[in-house]
């Protein structure tokens, strides 16, 4: 939630897949199991398969695909050329108030894409956060710890990101209004 807007949750403009329905993570695991293993060059997967497998899972609570956190409407829809632009909309990212903050976000996303291209993320199971999702990640401490883990993993993979580059993001998302002595 470090880069999200102020409005989050199942009725927001970009809900996470696991914020609305309890069974969505299980269904997503089933969908992911239909893709060939990473690095399996022997199995060709048509680009439109991603759209067909994930379209009804990456939705908001009303079934709207355009309001999901990850919107694949323009990735590779078999229904027409306007849906075959190769675009993945990451709708949960709020436009930061400064261009340099935007550049830091873009650098982070490029590093993550490059890292996952080399070594796809393939956990045995997805995490079922339940209500702990908002209980934890609305607090700056847990967001900071989670972000530090991401930056550490990227650095270990050879991407020289620095956590300090994102200090303005933390100040913006979690402003300090006072201190108790």
Task: Describe the predicted segments one by one.
Residues 1-181:
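C-terminal accessory/tail domains of diverse enzymes
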